[in-house]
Amino acid sequence: MNDAVTRLLGLGLRAGRVVIGVAGVRAGLQRGKLACVVLAADAGERTHDKVTRLAEAKGVPLVKGPDAATLGARLGRPPVQAVGVEDRALARGLTALAEE
């Protein structure tokens, strides 16, 4: 599942429809621009709590992704704890994968 998640995120990155990093994800959630959030499996407790609370308050689904190092490497970045998805169709695909 994690390979499929990172492949979809890679597509979104190339299309310019993802936000990388906790600060960007929090800002995107506050502005109502995100359709889904992928949180690294090893995200810190504080990060997990902040992002989860904000996503739940905004009605945005959360998807558990691979660890931060893997998530970042697959996106061509240093370790990444959170990725926000702006594209609704991409978000549906990610949430469907999470339900499998």
Task: Please annotate each region the language model reported.
Residues M1-L39:
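N-terminal first-folded block
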Residues R7, A23, A27, D49-R53, ...:
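Solvent-exposed alpha-helical segments within well-ordered globular domains of core cellular machineries
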Residues G16, K33-C36, K58, R77-Q81:
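A generic structural signal for short beta-strands and their flanking turns/coil linkers
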Residues Q30-R53, G59-P61:
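N-terminal positively charged helical leader segments and presequences
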Residues V51-P79:
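Mid-chain, well-packed structural core segment of small domains
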Residues A68-E100:
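C-terminal structural segments of small proteins and small subunits
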